[in-house]
């Protein structure tokens, strides 16, 4: 430690401890660093006595049973077909002519129409058959 450092007065430490105790009494939560450790268990709040008195005045509902969040199949739960969102997406077209037909039938708004790469694909997309070579 530095011998030239200013020493805290004992009165300052006491006032800090007093302020913390006052805060702990007003604040509804317990802080482990504000309470001294002791072997005696923590006492419940005074409000629990009042709430237990109120609880005794309430009528008992003995017929209540815990419910399941997911109902048992067949017991009150209607049988719905699985939603379409759970079905796997359709497989992509395997042939080039399928792709050409789909893009003509369902054109994309943002993208320009696809340009054919080969003359055979161009003839197929127009409805003509490709020229046969013998």
UniProtKB/Swiss-Prot annotation:
rRNA processing in keyword set: no
Region Disordered, annotated ranges: 1-21, 108-134
Main location: cytoplasm
Protein name stated in the entry: Uncharacterized protein C3orf22 homolog
PANTHER family given in the database record: CHROMOSOME 3 OPEN READING FRAME 22, HYPOTHETICAL PROTEIN LOC685964
Presence of the UniProt keyword Isomerase in the record: no
Subcellular location per the Swiss-Prot or TrEMBL entry: Cytoplasm
One GO term describing the cellular component: cytoplasm
Organism this protein belongs to: Bos taurus (Bovine)
UniProt keyword terms in alphabetical order: Cytoplasm
Extent of Basic residues compositional bias: 1-17
């Amino acid at each position: 430690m530095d011998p030239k450092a200013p020493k805290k007065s004992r009165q300052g430490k006491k006032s800090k401890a007093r302020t913390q105790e006052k805060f702990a009494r007003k604040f509804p939560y317990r802080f482990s660093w504000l309470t001294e450790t002791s072997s005696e268990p923590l006492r419940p709040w005074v409000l629990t006595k009042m709430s237990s008195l109120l609880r005794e005045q309430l009528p008992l509902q003995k017929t209540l049973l815990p419910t399941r969040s997911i109902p048992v199949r067949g017991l009150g739960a209607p049988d719905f077909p699985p939603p379409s969102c759970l079905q796997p997406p359709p497989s992509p077209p395997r042939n080039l002519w399928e792709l050409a037909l789909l893009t003509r039938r369902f054109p994309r708004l943002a993208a320009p129409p696809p340009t054919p790469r080969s003359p055979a694909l161009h003839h197929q997309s127009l409805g003509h058959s490709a020229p046969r070579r013998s």
